[in-house]
């Protein structure tokens, strides 16, 4: 998952840029704790959003609550799929088969179609489940696999990031960033 850059399908994904300010982790346990913390804080923001409002768009280019969750489900699902496919000896297509990193509008629309009909509760439960799968997977990785580049073919793109960075940008970073987006949505839509 990339840090959301909007719907411009020609945007360069955030993972293609060097980011010296990206959080780092001492070990897998620290990354797992960060995932749980960021996810809990993100999902807490949905507690007072009514199911009837999940498709309400606050601003023309903004995301609805359902789209925010679909985006998260899509990218965490892709991360898990990349690993599953590689471990099964299959060719992994990143970001997704038929798409390139400079054209992410298609996958986003697929995420919205695939997950947009879920209730907010169902989407949150599914996201918790996928995050738990990611954490379980992280516990199986050696320090070398997690922190050194070139440990997976799916991670060997132009960025040459180690797995931990891919996990961070598909979990902690968007959970944190989109929490702010949901708060802004609520300020514009929820009234006392």
Where do the model's predicted regions map?
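Short, helix-capping/interhelical loops that line the mouth of catalytic, cofactor-
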Residues: 13-30, 78-129, 189-192
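Short linear/disordered segments characteristic of secreted peptide precursors
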Residues: 9-10
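Proline-centered turn/helix-capping motifs that create local helix->coil transitions or kinks
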Residues: 139-147
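Short, contiguous alpha-helical
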Residues: 55-106, 146-192
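Alpha-helical bundle segments that constitute or directly flank the non-heme di-iron/ferroxidase center
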Residues: 24-53, 74-84, 169, 173-176
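A non-catalytic, amphipathic alpha-helix used as a structural packing/dimerization or gating element
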Residues: 34-41, 122-136, 173
């Amino acid at each position: 998952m990339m840090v959301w850059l909007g719907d411009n399908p020609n945007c360069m994904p955030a993972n293609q840029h060097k980011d010296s300010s990206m959080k780092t982790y001492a070990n897998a346990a620290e990354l797992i704790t960060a995932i749980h913390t960021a996810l809990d804080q993100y999902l807490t923001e949905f507690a007072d959003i009514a199911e009837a409002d999940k498709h309400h768009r606050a601003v023309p280019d903004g995301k609805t609550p359902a789209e925010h969750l679909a985006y998260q489900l899509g990218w965490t699902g892709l991360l898990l799929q990349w690993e599953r496919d590689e471990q099964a000896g299959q060719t992994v297509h990143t970001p997704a088969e038929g798409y390139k990193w400079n054209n992410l509008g298609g996958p986003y629309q697929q995420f919205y179609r695939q997950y947009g009909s879920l209730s907010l509760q169902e989407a949150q439960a599914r996201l918790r489940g996928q995050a738990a799968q990611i954490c379980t997977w992280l516990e199986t990785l050696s320090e070398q696999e997690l922190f050194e580049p070139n440990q997976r073919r799916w991670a060997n793109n132009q960025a040459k990031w180690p797995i931990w960075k891919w996990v961070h940008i598909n979990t902690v970073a968007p959970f944190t960033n989109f929490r702010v987006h949901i708060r802004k949505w609520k300020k514009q839509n929820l009234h006392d």
